[in-house]
Amino acid sequence: TTSATIAIEDSEVESDTKNSEDESNDDENSEEVEEIELGDKIVFGEYNGVSITWRVLKISPDKTEAMLVTDKIITMKAFDAADSDEYARHNGISYSSNDEEANANLELQAFIRGNSDWKDSDIRAWLNGEKELVDYGDSAPTKKKMSEHKNGYDIEPGFLSNFSKKEIEAIKPVRLETKANGLSDKEMVVTEDKVYLLTLEDLELFEKAGMNMLTKPTEECLEQDESKWYQDEQDGYGVEMHYWWLREPVLDSSSKCYAVGNEYWEEKIIENTVGLEGLGIRPAITVDLTSDVIFTKE
């Protein structure tokens, strides 16, 4: 009788344990499929050795896709490097930012200061680079081709090389239409990208998602940054937020793009020359929420 009683009790304990484990697994599964909402913080992929936190900007009506943008600036980089041997210098001639010839000659302007065309930009190549070596064509973004000869990224592995194969597969290629710059005879440039920068129109999504479009750099970004623009602005003006690039060009220029400002200046949107290496990068992606990847809320 005693043995039978013990066996029954052991069976009940095992049953209770199994039920407890099942409930625990159910809780874990419920967390995994927890519905993603606008403004949520999502952890996905990594860069600079740490996980990337993203914000949900947009969700498709059928809730199978979500547009994400990094919560903070993850790196400081020029949008595009000069094609000349050195920034603002060609054939032994130096061109200041106020140089009349360079400002009037759009081809020369793009050549010595960087080209604002998203399709052929260095930052597009880097963001979509899945390998250690990124193909920049005839001219790579070396330090010498940046405005202050800092933050070159010619030998830095492509952004997507930091992601697993499964994570890359979960990022959907998106057909993008971007306004053309002053050198083009077209109004729009069409590309297909997995990773991209936002446009002026995209900024409206922040308000719809209940989010502030102003942001600051990550600690890892500041450790990597050689320009120290953020620290200078912080020391000089006490700002916490920093500028970050959009992919939209200034139409009457070939070397300027729009960027989001910081909280110090009145203008929320600024124009800047694309060869300036002290502005931030906030990548955006569109992910497949039905993929095998678990998008974890922070």
Which ranges hold each PLM region?
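Collagenous Gly-X-Y triple-helix signature in extracellular proteins
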Residues: 28-298
